[in-house]
Structure formats: structure tokens, C-alpha cells
Amino acid sequence: MPRGIVVKYRSVLLQPRNIYMSLAELLRNTVTESLSKLYQQPFSDKDFQVNQTKPEFEGDYTIVLFSLIKKLKKSPEAAGNELGTHLTTVYPHLFSRYNIIKGFLNLSVAESYWVELLQKNYTDGNYGKQPAKGERVMVEYSSPNTNKPLHLGHLRNNFLGWSAAAILKANGYDIVKTCIANDRGIHICKSMVAWQLFANGATPESTGMKGDHFVGDYYVLFGTELKKQVEVLIAGGIEKEAAEKQAPIMLQAQQMLVDWEAGKPEVIELWKKMNSWVYAGFDVTYKRIGSDFDKTYYESDTYLLGKDLVEFGLKKGVFFQKEDGSVWIDLTADGLDEKIVRRKDGTAVYMTQDIGLAVKKYEEYQCNKSIYVVGNEQDYHFKVLKLICRKLDLPAADGIFHLSYGMVELPSGRMKTREGTVVDADDMIDEMVNVSKQKTEELGKVKDFTSDELKELYDTIGLGALKFFLLRVDPKKKMLFNPEESIDFQGFTGPFIQFIHARIKSILRKETAAPAAHFTTPLLPLEKELIVTMEQYPVIIEQAATDYNPSHIANYVYAVAKTFSSFYSEHKVASAESEEKKQLRLRLCQMTANIIASGMGLLGIKVPERM
């Protein structure tokens, strides 16, 4: 029995399935039915345990007999022989032989099952995907601030959100992709003040800069100027904390925020203009990385939402008011703490806004689930959000789910913004494309491409390397991004998988499988291993959707590519030892290429036809 990736997904193989009945589920159903017929009493799949057979024993799946023998009052040997004989006799197309070792019934799957699986699915480009479930899921991701360009952390967020949405869609869910633009607040005003002070009327057009980078430079400039002014105040005997509040440029930003909230025309005009520059820049980046949204919410439109819910919560007794007029909720009985929902001056806090927006989104889309793709520094916030919504008996409450993820770091350390040392998304993508160009040219296989084809190829490989590296890691884990490692054509990388796909396509351009074929020659070990690995694809998609975890897809597709690489290094296709073997292997090639293209597609990664 093939090992490695199969064992990794053992627990999922034995879960309830979808329209693609996995071998594991088929086995459980068959064994349950057989036990009931053999012993004339009811059985369920909870009466026995199924595992994959350990490498040192013969077989594919193992039935643990100990729980059965108590019910049957038979020895393991007797029960195993009766069940094994029944299965191999009544279902010869499914089980070819069995053996019993110390209370374990090891079953070997009939080779005809694997061949039939290949024959049935090798041309199906949608293999593993499910029909509509009639349930809607919202995935909110990206959520940028409109005072700076996207950075490396945003890339992980975008890739994770887009991929999670694609995986859920493949499982039959109706998907709504949304984004919340954080387009108001003191951080936005800082860029606006700096532009007023230092830009001299400069624009992205006049400087030849991308709009989000242009505005981001003024946010950095604000931080630089603030630091200078604070140092002057400290030198004059003012404490640092007071100096940071009293610095003239900070006071200007605070006044800018007051003027914005008051609707001062010239401030609103500047705010709209600078935001439009940023959105134009975002659009270029989003198009480049493939991110898209069905609806964008703007904080400037939603920040007042939820205020009526505070009054509702007070009347309901969920919230309480302190002497200073501020409104809170006491969550200490739930293992949390007290949380403010309205300041003493009557203004809303972020939590209040999020409660209001959750209600708005539910009213607009009636989603069964609302997934927030946000970094793990907000874990507590979303625990509180869901809990408050539940205590308010809001219909949106049960569907709230925080898809938390860890920070992305580089060897140089954690990313920062105020100091201007952030790793911009555009710069990172450019670097990856340049590295892909260098690596591809080193292979010496680019002479048959036009310049336009090469540009597209370098973009595809570079962006594919970046996406795969960021998605191959469990979202919950903090990760270290290594550009050089991510583009290794021989490693656990996107380019390796892309190369395998291109190699298969090269084979299929020269030869295609004949429509009709009959196979009698036994499968060789690597042929069987490849089919066994591909059989799991529907289960892996389902697992990735259940866990909201694209790394399951990334790990699986790599396993498929690696298994094919081992197979191809040992066995010829076009010049196979017989026509029967040639037809079988062409089918293996076609199904492998389809699964790689499908799986990488769920990660948002293109696979070239040629490399």
C-alpha cells in the first residue's frame, strides 16, 4: 500500500463523504452490510474501526476486530476468517484477499477497483468538486488601510481568503467575497496632513508613482516628522508620552479627523482624492495577484452602524452603563473580561461597528457562515464579537467564524510600517518574478518562447512560487518566508509542481489516450500508488473546506506531483513495453494533469502548458 500522503489524511478518509464515495466509505458500508447479513443482527460503522494497513503488513485497509468479537462472542481468528471470506467472495471486484494478524483483519483492494477508478475519472476536469448545497458563505478578506500599499502580510491574507473561498465553492457552497476598506480614522489623516505639508501639489501622475505607494510615502513621512518634533519637545523637558500628544503635526492630524467627522468640504475633498489614488493602486495589485470581491464595504459608510444595538442591548440587560456614561458588557462569567461598546462621549468603538456590520451583511446576503480572514492578533476581538452577537440573539451570531492566521516574517525580522521598512507586496512580487526569470534561464530551456510568452511564464512561476509558499503552511502558524527556497524547482514548491504539469502536457501533446481500452496486465507499484493518491482528491477538497485550510490542498497536490515524478522516472509512457501499458499510463498522465491544474487552481495558481 502506498504510504506518506495517504497516512497523513487517514482520519479524514473515514469521515462521511459526498457524491464521490471514497474507498474508505465504501469499505465501511460494505463491512457494515456484510456483518448484518452474516450474523443476522444490526451493526453500524461504530461497531468497528478501520485504519490503513501498516507498512510492514500485507493489505490496504485493516479492520480492528476487538470490538466486534465482544459482540459476536467469537475469537479474532474465527470472526476475521468469516468476515474476510464473505468480503472476498461476495465482493471480488472490491477485495482480492485477506490475512489476519493478532485481531486485525487486513484487506487487499482488488486491482480492478483502481483501474475502474482511473477509467471513470481520467478525463473529468471537475473530479472532486461537488454540486450546489444550497448554502451561502461569505468570506471577508484583504481589509486594507487606505494610507499605504499592501504588504507581505496582506499577501498571505489575500491568498488565504481567495483560496478558502475557491475551496468552499468547489464543495458546493454559494460564495460571496467581500472586503472592508479601512478608509477613515487618524491613520488616514496622518497621510493627508503630511501631503498638505510636504507635497507641494505632487500627485501620482506628476511623480510617475503608483497611487498607494505615493500616499504610503506620506504616511511614512508623517512618522519621520513626528519623531523629530517629539525629540525637540523632549529636549525642552516634556515627557515622551505628552510630547507625542502635543507635537504640532499630531495636533494637526487630530484636528483633521475632527474636521472630517464634521464634514468640512475641503477635508472631505482631499480625503476622497487621496483615497482614489490608493484604490487605483490597490486595483493594479489585486488584478496582478488575482484577488476579487463581490462587495466592498467602506468603514466611512459603516462606522456609525451598531449604535442602535447599544440601546437595544441596554434595554435587554446585556449591556450596562457606568457612572461616566460609557456602556460596557461584562463577559467575566464567560472567561473573558469587561468590554466597552460605547465611549462616555457617545462615540462608537470598533466592536460596535463590527456588530452593526455583521447585522448589515446578514440582512443583505442571509449567509449561513460569515468568515473573517484576519490575523491572530485579533483572536480575542472575534471571540468577543461572536459572544456579544449571541447574547443579543442576533441571527448573524452563529455564522461568525474567525479564520485566524499567523504573521509572515522575513529573515530580517518582523515587518514595520511607520519606519518605512515594510515589505511592499508589489516589491515582493517583482522580486519573485525576477528570481523566477533567473532560475528559469539557468535551466536553459527558454529559447523556444517569444518575449511575451517568457514574460507571462516568469510572472506565472514567480507568483505561483509566492502563493504556494504562503499557502502550504497551516494558516494558524507563524511563518518565515524565504524567497530563494520558494522558487526551488526541485523542492516543496509551486514551481516544482508547475514543472511536473508542463512535463505531463508535453507528453500529452504527442500522445493521447485511446477512447476504448481493456486492461489485464497487473498494475506496477508506482502505477497503483499514483491512482491511490489521486483517489483521495475529493476527500482532500472536503477536508480543506471543513478546516478552512488551503495547506491541505497544497500538501496534497505536491504529493501527487512527487508521486508522478517517481513514476515517470521509472516508467516510459510513449515507448511503454506494450500498447496496453501505454494506454494505461496516458490515462495516468491525463488524470494527474487534471488534478494538478484543479488543485493549483484552488490555490489561485496558474499552471503553464510549457516550461
Residue ranges and their predicted role:
Residues 113-128:
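Secondary-structure boundary elements
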Residues 20-115, 131-611:
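Non-catalytic interaction-recognition regions
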Residues 7-20:
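Short, Lys/Arg-enriched N-terminal segments with co-localized hydrophobic residues
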